[in-house]
Regions:
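Bacterial N-terminal signal peptides
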Residues: 6-17
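Histidine-/acidic-rich catalytic cores in large beta-rich domains
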Residues: 21-293
Length: 293
């Protein structure tokens, strides 16, 4: 009996140690309509954020996140610093180096740059000619790149496209399963988090020609826990932090967050956590160096 109890205690300690390696992070819980901060394995802060799909921790400690049909920047004291409201669903936001905020409006098909005062200073429409509503599946995550172009995940069309400042497509690649999140890396490669349309959720790294050079999927993880891959963050040493959204399947075993290395070793997971229903995006609080999100 003592041996059994000792084994159970040791297993729990090992489990907690693994979770602790994920460190402190901010997350978006799509199903609960909140964003939150987890520190030392406890949720210490949260804020209302309906259908949130994108979150950043800014250098000043404030949080920038999408709120269904808006974007909000707040302090840890819940003071509003920036707010943008839209009639279109929004899945993407990004604070730019010039202090403006990039916003991707889904149905409207607009790539916006908004000043700190809330004024639209750049507006690029990427809807096909003759279309006034791209529908809810038109766009998910999007990013403004250092070269001034825009990288957009077209969930419905199952492709990723890069647009120039005039809204012209300069690069594209098909992504069976539907892309949700995109990251352009320093070497020009592109990371894409893929959803569940083909029942093959995965993250792929593509070179400049669109060829897959790295991939992680359920083939690499025992138990096939991946359901729908969402927001992610890539670190210079090759580690990748990514969310596994479980809202379409509602499984008993909820694996919300993974941290893996280039060899596809699982460094930590966050699973079955009280206070979390479905995670759609994440941003580490522990990484002070350059990362890609």
């Amino acid at each position: 009996m003592r041996t059994i109890i000792y084994t159970l205690i040791l297993s729990c300690i090992c489990c907690l140690a693994t979770v602790a390696q994920c460190g402190n992070f901010a997350g978006a819980d799509y199903s609960q309509g909140i964003v939150f901060i987890m520190e030392n394995n406890r949720i210490v802060w949260q804020h209302k954020a309906p259908a949130s799909n994108d979150i950043w921790v800014l250098p000043n400690g404030n949080l920038l996140f999408s709120t269904g049909k808006g974007v909000l920047e707040v302090t840890r004291q819940n003071d509003t610093v920036f707010h943008y409201a839209s009639e279109s669903p929004i899945f993407a936001c990004q604070r730019l180096k010039n202090g403006n905020t990039f916003i991707g409006e889904c149905n409207a098909g607009r790539l916006l740059e908004v000043s700190p005062e809330g004024n639209i200073v750049s507006d690029i429409c990427i809807l096909p000619e003759g279309i006034s509503d791209g529908t809810f599946a038109f766009m998910r995550n999007a990013r403004k790149l250092d070269n001034g172009h825009y990288l957009v995940a077209h969930y419905g069309d199952e492709c990723v496209k890069e647009y120039d400042q005039a809204g012209k497509v300069v690069w594209q690649v098909k992504i069976p399963g539907g892309p949700h999140s995109v990251i352009r890396l320093r070497d020009g490669h592109t990371l894409v988090a893929v959803a569940d349309k083909t029942q093959n959720p995965r993250i792929v790294e593509l070179d400049k020609q669109g060829k897959t050079v790295w991939e992680i999927s359920n083939k690499d993880i025992p138990g096939k826990p991946l359901k729908f891959l969402g927001g992610m963050q890539y670190f210079p040493d090759g580690r990748l932090l990514f969310t596994n959204w479980v809202g379409h399947v509602n499984p008993e075993q909820r694996n919300h967050l993974f941290l893996v290395d280039r060899e596809k070793n699982i460094l930590c997971t966050v699973e079955n956590r009280e206070g979390i229903q479905t995670m759609s995006s994440v941003f580490s609080l522990d990484e002070n160096g350059k990362s890609y999100h």
